[in-house]
């Protein structure tokens, strides 16, 4: 099957699927086993892109069982961009701004717009920060760690880059107990999809060339965004992930604060075998889009052997969809 036809199949299944709390999602006891899909009749091999699209729909539903349902995006409010500061750089203009995510919730961010595009459109990038009180300042080049200034670096390379604060970091005050979200992770996904909305609204951005990049917290937030928003064609994660059994040897407490996924504790008892999704599925669900991971050999949080196992498990899916080279990792 040609890739354009495959995109139509995937889109149809994802967009017509029932909400996570209504969908009867089959149980997948082994998230590492990707070349199967399940229904009421039992387990079936994944032999075609259509088979994989069924499993992929189950992956998104499983994530929403743990994170809460992705809010309806059919009646989004205007972004209402409000610029607070403008910095005139040598090769770009940097705007400090807020935009309306939903209700009265405004997201603080930086937006880099290259100069001298001469009417041409360029790629748009969502650059997501690590766990740091600096929040968006660090990727934007306003923190002391130059090796984490990836938002600034990409802007210098000629891309339009948006660098948001994650809720409760930087200038983004947020009360997770006062919203309607089941998890902070789903709120982050929604906000980051709104960042993509903003990029796509810019005349300088080619909406078919959207990427996401992040380090640590930003690394797995880039993967979460990439699963749910198929406008994101390239996902880059640095020191950002490993499967649940390899995260501190299966000790999942670090995932359970209000900022992240509390149901991992409250519903699934901190048991990685009970959580209805894992990174094997997330990485495979990017296909046929491109995924690049930078995974260090001695990361205490995101253990590298787990990364190796995920890459090996996901590779057959990329091969099935005709894009084996779109899955890349550097150790």
Regions found by a protein language model. Give the residues of each.
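Mobile cap/lid helix-loop segments that gate and shape the active-site cleft of serine hydrolases
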Residues: 234-282, 303-312, 317-324
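Alpha/beta-hydrolase fold nucleophile elbow
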Residues: 204-216
């Amino acid at each position: 099957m040609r890739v354009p036809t495959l995109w139509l199949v995937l889109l149809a299944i994802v967009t017509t699927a029932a909400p996570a709390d209504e969908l009867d999602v089959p149980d997948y006891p082994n998230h590492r086993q990707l070349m199967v899909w399940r229904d009421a009749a039992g387990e079936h091999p994944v032999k075609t892109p259509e088979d994989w699209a069924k499993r992929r729909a189950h992956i998104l539903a499983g994530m929403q069982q743990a994170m809460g349902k992705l809010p309806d995006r059919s009646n989004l409010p205007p972004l209402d961009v409000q610029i607070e500061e403008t910095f005139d750089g040598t090769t770009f203009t940097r705007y400090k701004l807020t935009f309306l995510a939903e209700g009265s919730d405004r997201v603080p961010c930086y937006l880099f717009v290259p100069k001298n595009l001469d009417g041409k459109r360029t790629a748009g990038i969502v650059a997501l920060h690590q766990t740091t009180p600096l929040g968006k300042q660090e990727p934007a080049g306003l923190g002391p760690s130059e090796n984490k200034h990836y938002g600034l670096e990409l802007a210098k390379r000629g891309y339009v880059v948006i660098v948001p604060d994650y809720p409760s970091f930087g200038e983004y005050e947020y009360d997770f107990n006062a919203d309607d979200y089941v998890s902070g992770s789903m709120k982050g996904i929604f906000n980051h999809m709104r960042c993509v909305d903003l990029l796509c609204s810019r005349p300088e951005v080619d909406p078919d060339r959207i990427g996401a990049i992040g380090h640590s917290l930003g690394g797995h937030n880039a993967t979460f965004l990439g699963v749910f928003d198929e406008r994101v064609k390239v996902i880059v994660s640095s020191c950002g992930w490993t499967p649940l059994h390899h995260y501190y040897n299966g000790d999942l407490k670090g995932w359970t604060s209000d900022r992240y996924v509390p149901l991992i504790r409250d519903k699934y008892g901190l048991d990685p075998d009970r959580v209805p999704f894992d990174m094997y599925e997330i990485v495979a669900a990017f296909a046929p889009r491109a995924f690049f991971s930078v995974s260090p050999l001695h990361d205490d949080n995101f253990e590298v052997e787990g990364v190796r196992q995920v890459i090996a498990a996901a590779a057959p899916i990329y091969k099935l969809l005709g894009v084996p080279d779109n899955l890349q990792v550097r150790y």
